[in-house]
């Protein structure tokens, strides 16, 4: 049972030219989504850890919490995960939970990342999907 979830908001996806919404709006929208679930903490950590690298955020949480880390991503991100800074180290330090995204299952299962990852640290979650991107979700 998870005791706490940390939803780390980034200024922007490094693989996209720009973000459709500003940071303050995204944080506000995320807090609205979680409602009164006190175990979910929404935060912007880049200023605290002085980095926008995922591996540095994971190291920060690991040192702070000394607990098992589950890293959640969409199947669309798994396709390009091998391009992330220190992606192999991230996969060694975390259990990676991948949520299927419409149109990405086959691509993600055939990706360089999927072929190279240790499958015991990787769980692929399928669920009733809605064909909507995270950018579209934020506009709701």
Model regions and ranges:
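Nucleotidyltransferase catalytic core that binds NTPs
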Residues: 1-140
